[in-house]
């Protein structure tokens, strides 16, 4: 194989090797330096939802259509591009987090961080606190939540709606200014387009 081909295919091969090894840390370090150990699917609510997910960082923005399901055995997330291509598939069974995507295309955000964000937004507050180190503080109200460490805000969230998976969930992770906005689609909406009469 010549050097040019190796240069072109090396990133894709590295990404596939990482996926094949299932070497995703179940205790990811969030922007700001605090680690969070993912909690079991059984400690969260059972639900399924179709959501429009917008991920923004550093002026760049990715939009996905996500199918998310949680039950006592596993959390599963499938992310589709606006054109319908599967760009991310993540499963978490309480022991191992596995992610896959098309060759040569990395996920828009660390899959373990994405699962952590879902847990901060949707899991009971006590379950979230169980995954945090002692110096981190998680405050969770009906519509707002905040993670802080040593007086610094690291994650803020706002949700609307009465029950999981909520109508909207907006999360900001500092200091990276990583924004994740999730909007639950209903039978009246499809792909962000209102189809109600």
Question: What are the residue ranges of the model-derived segments?
Answer:
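Bacterial N-terminal signal peptides that target proteins for export
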Residues: 2-12
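C-terminal motif of bacterial Sec signal peptides marking the signal peptidase cleavage site
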Residues: 18-21
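Mature, soluble, non-transmembrane domains
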Residues: 23-27, 31-33, 50-52, 85, ...
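Post-signal-peptide N-terminal segment of Sec-exported extracytoplasmic proteins
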Residues: 41-76
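Well-ordered beta-strand positions
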Residues: 67-69, 91, 139
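Envelope-exposed proteins and targeting segments
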Residues: 73, 93-95, 143
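Primarily extracytoplasmic ectodomains and periplasmic/lumenal surface modules that are beta-strand-rich
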Residues: 74-76, 83-86
């Amino acid at each position: 194989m010549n050097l040019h081909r190796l240069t072109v295919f090396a990133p894709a091969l590295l990404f596939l090797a990482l996926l094949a090894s299932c070497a995703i840390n179940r205790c990811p370090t969030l922007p700001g330096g605090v680690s969070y150990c993912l909690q079991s699917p059984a400690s969260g609510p059972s639900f399924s939802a179709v959501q429009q997910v917008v991920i923004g960082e550093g002026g760049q923005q990715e939009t996905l259509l996500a199918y998310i399901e949680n039950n006592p055995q596993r959390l599963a997330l499938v992310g589709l591009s606006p054109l319908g291509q599967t760009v991310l598939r993540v499963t978490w069974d309480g022991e191992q987090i596995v992610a896959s995507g098309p060759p040569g295309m990395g996920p828009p955000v660390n899959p373990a961080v994405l699962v952590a964000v879902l847990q901060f937004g949707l899991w009971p507050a006590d379950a979230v606190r169980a995954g945090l180190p002692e110096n981190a503080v998680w405050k969770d109200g009906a519509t707002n939540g905040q993670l802080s460490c040593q007086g610094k805000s690291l994650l803020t969230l706002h949700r609307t709606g009465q029950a999981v998976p909520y109508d909207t969930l907006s999360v900001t992770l500092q200091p990276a200014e990583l924004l994740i906005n999730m909007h639950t689609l209903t039978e009246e909406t499809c792909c962000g387009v209102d189809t109600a009469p």
